[in-house]
Swiss-Prot record:
HAMAP family: Ala_tRNA_synth_B. Catalyzes the attachment of alanine to tRNA(Ala) in a two-step reaction: alanine is first activated by ATP to form Ala-AMP and then transferred to the acceptor end of tRNA(Ala). Also edits incorrectly charged Ser-tRNA(Ala) and Gly-tRNA(Ala) via its editing domain. This is Alanine--tRNA ligase. It comes from Bordetella avium (strain 197N). It is found in: Cytoplasm. Binds 1 zinc ion per subunit. It is an enzyme of class 6 (ligase). Belongs to the class-II aminoacyl-tRNA synthetase family. Pfam families: DHHA1 (PF02272), tRNA-synt_2c (PF01411), tRNA_SAD (PF07973).
Amino acid sequence: MKSSEIRQKFLQFFQSKGHSIVPSSSLVPGNDPTLLFTNSGMVQFKDVFTGKEKRPYTRATSSQRSVRAGGKHNDLENVGYTARHHTFFEMLGNFSFGDYFKQDAIRFAWELLTTVYKLPVEKLWVTVYQEDDEAYDIWAKEVGVPTERIIRIGDNKGARYASDNFWQMGDTGPCGPCTEIFYDHGPDIWGGPPGSPEEDGDRYIEIWNLVFMQFERDAAGNMTPLPKPCVDTGMGLERIAAVLQGVHSNYEIDLFQKLITAAARETGVQDLHDNSLKVIADHIRACSFLIVDGVIPSNEGRGYVLRRIVRRALRHGYKLGQTKPFFYRLVPDLVAQMGEAYPELANMAERVGQVLKQEEERFGETLEHGMKILDVALAQVPKGGLLDGNTLFTLYDTYGFPVDLTADICREREVEIDMAGFEAAMERQRDQARAAGKFKMAEGLNYEGAQTRFEGYEQLELSGAKVTALYVDGTQTDQVRAGQQAVVVLDATPFYAESGGQVGDTGLLVADGLRFAVADTLKVQAGVFGHHGLLEEGVLKVGDTLLARVDAVRRARTVRNHSATHLMHKALREVLGAHVQQRGSLVDPDKTRFDFAHDAPMTAEQIARVEAIVNAEVLANQAAQARVMAYDDAVKGGAMALFGEKYGDTVRVLDIGFSRELCGGTHVSRTGDIGLFKIVSEGGVAAGVRRVEAITGDNALVWVQEQNALLQRAAGVLRSPVAELPERIAQVQDQVKALEKDLEQARAKLAASAGNDLADKSAVEIKGVKVLAAVINDVDPKALRGMVDNLKDKLKPAIVLLAASADGKISLVGGVTADQTAKVKAGDLVGFVAAQVGGKGGGRPDMAMGGGTDVAALPAAIASVQDWVNERL
């Protein structure tokens, strides 16, 4: 019985028993923030079980896609090494919400297993909770299971109700006993019945768990019977498929065998029992469905778990000799197996492939380098030894190796990892990052005076500003002398302190015979402004009165960019959609840099529309208005609160053009003051986050003039009017392509000539097979594959290996005619030579490619081919 039939029969059986078939919910739980991923069938019904949600049915059945990787439920490290661990699995379940209870739940389960699935009754064992006499009697007296195959399990986990057969949603809440059904694989497999000392063996395998929620547990541990007890059951599709298909390992069922075969196809591996193929087959399921449900590879949360799974799969592909992107090519094979049951997978297959390919390409750049570092480090660690934490951290921080990936490799080499050392290295980096943060100059200053009164909204110059504190090298002092760097705190200031993405002001603090150049303004603490800079003249003391003067030109450029950011944010939401939310910003005199939530690059048309909308607001020359009001009133009035910002009870609301946002920054008086708005770049900075950089005013004018000058220069070089540049460039490109084609044909002729010479002069016959191994000079490495194909045809039966080197890199191509691949495989041949020249290789049995870097070792490696082939023919 195929896996798809097993799933279908399960759902149809319970539908015939009055159950509503409920589609699988997302792998990202929508109702439980404590869960990283959906890990069982009951998750989507949690609020129904607790009474918070009512549904139009009291009986339900589902096939729930589930993930156990990361967080409390993490099977990742075991996947590929055991018969039943998976990152992704399907949980078949039936549920009763105050409808039927133990009798029907047990009767339904037994009928499905023995009548529909036709499992031999003598192969089925059951367990019940020690005190659940009701379930015991149903199994023994009504179903007729022999008592020797019914096992009572007590509190076997060290506390009251702590048992394999007692389920609890949490420390408090719904709970109750459960009964589990086991399948006996027979005496040929080691293991004992559940509850016995040998229960960890593989002979008796749990296939179905029936949970009876019949109590409410309070904080004191008291159990109160529920007025409407419920049923929650779960049976892993992969486990029951293994039983019904007569195999012992989940990886031997039809669904996995198709995926394993596909993984072997993409990696060029012949041994379908290789554990790495199991890892890849498992991981393509988890990765694909996580992407379907909106998870994108990133460096935090669910996205990082996905990234870890992808990179673990890629490492196993690399272990099999596959150095090129391959994982994404398994998506169509997965759709063929599971697309009918889960149409959302088929609908998003292209998107899934794109995300996986992008992640493969990103990690592929560092995987090989990281593996070399790890190989060198492991060569110095004996079996049973410890890989140091600094190497672990370097692989994690520089090469993107998740720690569990490195641990996976170390386990294969029988080496432990120094997690304490890794955590210490990680903490050192955190300390360094904190020290280098944006409050680097102000952090740690001890200030206990009054807050600074900010006057910079209305004026850029303030007389009578009194010095309330001075700091040199982080230490409070009474005076500062000329030539010293210092932080000055004033009772009032026109200087804006860095906040909300807007940089701090610069300028001067002056008095008679005294001049302090302010290089930056940062907050020492909430409401206290620190003016950071250099005392150029005089002696500055606490209590001095100064004239504070902001650099007006720099401030004007900054406020133009800040106000333009508000208009751009609003325009982005109009053009791209209401999902656009700010994820970060930097506003300085040169530009505005704006990060926002969006999952695709902006098109040229979208960028042009945003520019047009913003510049229309600029031309309207509307006045900006700032008001202070209660936060709740501001939000009710339509003001946008920004991601990551913290607001007090009272906020400042800025209306500028068609935008209304909460903002404490400084802005233009009218939109016309912005002058001109131009987007100069757009790109991605993280999964689901795009970045736009834009300029305004005189900076935008200079940029336009520079772009025009570049166009004029290009027109001069190509001898074409600016308006005709696209056509002229297309002509030049066509000419270049034609010349490249001529060059390629010439190289092919040279290569063919060189190949003919090799066939005549260098091929030797070994046991009736022509063997040719040679280094080709003055030949483009890209031409090697064609040469190998030609030589195979010319010499067949033949085994050919050609090498070329350029710029310190060796290219290897091996080919074996089809009639010889049973004895000699091209992938093995290329791998043999590549290993001697400091590289790796692999591919199909008839054609393989590889490379290396040790050019000096190449002649000896080529010379060794004949003996290697002779041993195998």
